[in-house]
C-alpha cells in the first residue's frame, strides 16, 4: 500500500521515500532482467533522501546534488559527529550517475551491490533516529 504523501519540506516524507528506494534496492534483486547498477542507484537514492531528511529536520539549507559526502559535510559543519557506517555513504555517490550509463564503468559486482545495500540501510536507520530525536527536542 502506498503511504500518504506529505509536503516536500516534511522530513518524514523524505524518509518515507528513502525507505521506498531501499525496499526496491533490496527486493528487486529477485526480478529477472534487473541490473545491479539500477539497484545500487536505488541504494544511493535511499541514502541521499535519508540524509536530506536530516538536513530538513535541522533546517540546514542544501543543494540538490547527489554527492553524499558534500551533504554529510553540512551536518558535520553543525557539530554532529557521524557514525562510521554513515560516513561510508560517500561510496554510494558513484552509483548516482556514472554506473547507470552503459559502458562508462565496469559492471557492478554482486559484492559491490551487497555493500551498497548495507551502507544504505545504515544511513536510513541513522536518519530515522535523527529525525525522531529532533522531533522530541523541538517539543521541549
Residue ranges, per PLM feature:
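Terminal alpha-helical segments
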Residues: 1-140
Amino acid at each position: 500500500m502506498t503511504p500518504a504523501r506529505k509536503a516536500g519540506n516534511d522530513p518524514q516524507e523524505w524518509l518515507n521515500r528513502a525507505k521506498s528506494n531501499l525496499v526496491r534496492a533490496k527486493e528487486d534483486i529477485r526480478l529477472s532482467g534487473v541490473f545491479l547498477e539500477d539497484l545500487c542507484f536505488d541504494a544511493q537514492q535511499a541514502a541521499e533522501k535519508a540524509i536530506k531528511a536530516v538536513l530538513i529536520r535541522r533546517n540546514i539549507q542544501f543543494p540538490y546534488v547527489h554527492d553524499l559526502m558534500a551533504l554529510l559535510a553540512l551536518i558535520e559543519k553543525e557539530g554532529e559527529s557521524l557514525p562510521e557506517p554513515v560516513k561510508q555513504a560517500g561510496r554510494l555517490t558513484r552509483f548516482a550517475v556514472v554506473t547507470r550509463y552503459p559502458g562508462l564503468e565496469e559492471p557492478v559486482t554482486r559484492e559491490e551491490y551487497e555493500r551498497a545495500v548495507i551502507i544504505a540501510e545504515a544511513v536510513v536507520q541513522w536518519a530515522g533516529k535523527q529525525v525522531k530525536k529532533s522531533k522530541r527536542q523541538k517539543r521541549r
